[in-house]
Swiss-Prot record:
PANTHER family, per database record: PROTEIN SMG (PTHR38692:SF1)
Family that this chain belongs to: Belongs to the Smg family.
NCBIfam families on file: PRK03430.1
Biological source species: Klebsiella pneumoniae (strain 342)
Pfam (any one): DUF494
Record-given protein name: Protein Smg
Amino acid sequence: MFDVLMYLFETYIHNEAEMRVDQDKLTRDLTDAGFEREDIYNALMWLEKLADYQEGLVEPMQLASDPLSLRVYTEEECQRLDASCRGFLLFLEQIQVLNLETREMVIERVLALDTAEFELEDLKWVILMVLFNIPGCENAYQQMEELLFEVNEGMLH
């Protein structure tokens, strides 16, 4: 399912391709690209839930905004988000790429992924997808994109 999301984000969303794509045509295109129908369905449902945030149909969990408070992760969250992922989320909050609401959206979307393995690189892409879809997060998206691609470019040298 995560592979389908990555493909969709890179092919349609990130490249600003035509957003009004017929779902049946999209499913056919993804099937032709080699993805399984169940993964396609799950990815489209995942994106639909993300769109609910964008449209204001779902509100992120409201938490205390005391600057001295610290997010305590549940056991389920710790199983999916290892220490490096949790540390990266904290780092993004500290540099104000994420706020309390967007952090909770990211965590919720990560937990909704149907994947056995989840790494820091995967988290970075989920963060990009969330920020891209939330109105008013354009600057945060741009900062995250710069962070993601600066690090990856640095690895090539």
